[in-house]
Regions:
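Polyanionic, low-complexity intrinsically disordered segments
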Residues: 103-107, 114, 120-179
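Helix-loop junctions and short alpha-helical segments
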Residues: 1-114
């Protein structure tokens, strides 16, 4: 049973990693002036970067310093703040990525807690995972194991689908709204 639960955890990590890559790609493409189905974002700086690589290196240097090489994308609160720093928002401005993340922030935080629990075995990750399962399902799981949770049936689904399927479908749907 433990091997099957580990496979569910691995599948979730793969889906969540794809979600993070999607967020990162959309963000940097927005900074380069790429048009999405709803239009083009307006930047705080007033001008677009000429390449994705330049946008990425500039943002990383500005946020983390010249020696940093990457940013983390798992925390929706941090991604929303990042969007607000570089993309104009408010009346008359699109700020699509920020809007979608903000409107789904609590749910995305819970998904990040599931991810955090899979990759970290400490008190903080257990506490946050238990908080997520209590909010989503009204219970905690033995030893705070995400595999058991991801294999469990989602009672809010009209079909007999597991939480892993629910979360994957949600992430795909949110990504589709941003492109």
């Amino acid at each position: 049973m433990y091997k099957l639960e580990s496979l569910y955890e691995l599948a979730f990590l793969r889906a969540f990693a794809a979600w993070e890559a999607c967020l990162e790609g959309i963000f940097y493409r927005s900074l380069c002036g790429h048009s999405f189905i709803t239009g083009r974002e307006i930047l705080v700086s007033g001008s677009y970067f000429s390449t994705i690589a330049l946008a990425e290196s500039s943002v990383i240097a500005q946020l983390k310093g010249a020696k940093a090489t990457y940013l983390l994308w798992h925390n929706p609160t941090d991604v929303i703040k990042r969007c607000r720093m570089f993309i104009r928002s408010g009346k008359g401005f699109l700020a699509l990525q920020e809007a979608i993340l903000s409107s789904n922030q609590a749910r995305l935080e819970y998904l990040s807690y599931v991810r955090h629990r899979i990759v970290h075995d400490n008190a903080d990750s257990r506490r946050k995972f238990d908080k997520a399962t209590l909010a989503l399902l009204g219970r905690v799981y033995p030893n705070s194991r995400p595999g058991k949770f991801l294999r469990a049936l989602d009672p809010s689904s009209p079909t007999r689908r597991k939480w892993l399927e629910t979360f994957t479908a949600e992430l795909v749907g949110l990504a589709g709204q941003m492109v």
